[in-house]
Each structure stands twice: as structure tokens, then as C-alpha cells.
């Protein structure tokens, strides 16, 4: 019977790996920051790239067959091989298909999620402050205690999502679909833009939702919505 031991002297923390060090299959760079790197022509087949920051990264000449990109972050400037679909890889970025994804307490500040599909996603406690969520589908998502301060939520489809205790302060909610959300208990809409046409509908919700105190923002949904009246 044999056992395998990790050589701690030769071990390199995955998050410190640089793209120029990539060699061989199953290269481990989990959590590494490769932002704005030109990776060049490299074999990244089977590579572990989950949680990597790939915003602005050029991977267009790489072999990404079987690479694990779950929760890696990309943006519109990320370049990829023509035959690779990052939208269905589990990575986070514009157009990503993340239905039912577990993103509880994730740090998604400033992330570009335009047009992403996050139906039924678990986003409770996630920090989406400053994120771009224009045209994103969040129907059935769990956004309880999520932070969306200053987020761009234009034409975002919230559907039947749960917004209890969510912090939307300063968010742009122009043409966002909020009429069918499950609950706004303790939700703070202070300083939001684009809610003028929905104020009456939101203020007609159950008093249990509207008057629930949010100890973090020190407000209620009712108070925050009424503050938006001209």
C-alpha cells in the first residue's frame, strides 16, 4: 500500500501561478489573477482555472479542452478560441448561463453581468455593488441580504426573486421588472433611479414587507420608496 505526500518545498500556491508558467495538462491556477494578460499559445487542456480573474485576458490561442472555469471572471474584452463557449462554462460574466448557481456571499463587485441568465441562482449575501446587471434575468433568484449598491439594473428581470433585506441604495432600476418579486421585506431603495413608474405598485405591497426594519441600512422599504417621490 502506497501513499502520496505533497512536497511542500516544491508546492506553489495556485493563486500565485502566472500564465507564462502554464505547462502540461491539469495546470492548477485556481484563484489566480491573469487580468489583461496575453497568455499566448499554451496547452491549458484540463487546467484548473476556477475563480481566476480573466478580465481582458487573451486566451484565443490556447487549448482549453476540458479546462475548469467555474466561477472564473471574464468580461467583454476577454478573448477566447472560436470554438470555446465561456458562457456555458460556469464562469461569471456577460451572457453567462448560471441558472441555479451557488453564489452565496460571493464578491461580485463591479462585475459585468449584462444579459446573464441567473434564474433560480443562490445569491444571498452576495456583494454586487457597482455590478452591471442590465438585461439580466434573475427570476426566482435568492437575493436576500444581497448588496446591490450603485448597481446598474436597467431592464433587469427580477421575476419572482426574493429581495428581503437587499440593499439597492443608489442603484439604477430603469425599466427593471419588480412587480412580481416574492418579497421586499426590509429592502432599501434609497437614492435609486428609474423607479418613478413603479412607486405606487411597490408601495401597495403588504405592510409586513414595507415596514420591516433593516438594521444595517436603518430604514424600511416604505421609507426608502417614499423618499424617491419628487
Region spans (language model):
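Tandem repeat scaffolds
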Residues: 1-230
Amino acid at each position: 500500500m502506497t501513499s502520496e505526500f505533497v512536497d511542500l518545498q516544491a508546492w506553489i500556491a495556485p493563486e500565485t501561478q502566472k500564465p507564462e508558467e502554464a505547462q502540461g495538462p491539469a495546470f492548477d491556477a485556481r484563484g489566480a489573477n491573469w487580468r489583461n494578460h496575453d497568455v499566448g499559445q499554451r496547452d491549458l487542456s484540463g487546467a484548473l482555472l476556477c475563480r481566476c480573474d480573466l478580465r481582458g485576458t487573451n486566451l484565443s490561442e490556447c487549448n482549453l479542452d476540458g479546462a475548469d472555469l467555474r466561477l472564473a471572471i471574464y468580461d467583454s474584452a476577454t478573448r477566447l478560441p472560436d470554438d470555446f463557449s465561456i458562457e456555458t462554462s460556469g464562469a461569471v460574466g456577460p451572457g453567462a448561463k448560471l441558472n441555479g448557481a451557488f453564489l452565496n456571499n460571493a464578491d461580485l463587485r463591479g462585475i459585468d453581468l449584462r444579459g446573464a441568465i441567473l434564474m433560480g441562482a443562490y445569491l444571498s449575501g452576495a456583494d454586487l455593488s457597482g455590478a452591471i446587471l442590465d438585461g439580466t434575468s434573475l427570476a426566482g433568484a435568492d437575493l436576500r441580504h444581497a448588496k446591490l449598491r450603485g448597481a446598474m439594473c436597467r431592464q433587469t428581470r427580477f421575476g419572482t426573486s426574493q429581495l428581503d433585506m437587499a440593499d439597492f441604495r443608489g442603484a439604477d432600476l430603469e425599466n427593471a421588472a419588480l412587480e412580481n418579486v416574492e418579497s421586499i421585506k426590509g429592502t432599501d431603495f434609497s437614492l435609486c433611479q428609474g423607479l418613478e413608474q413603479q412607486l405606487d405598485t411597490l408601495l401597495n405591497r403588504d405592510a409586513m414587507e414595507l415596514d420591516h426594519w433593516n438594521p444595517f441600512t436603518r430604514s424600511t422599504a416604505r421609507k426608502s420608496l417614499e423618499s424617491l417621490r419628487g
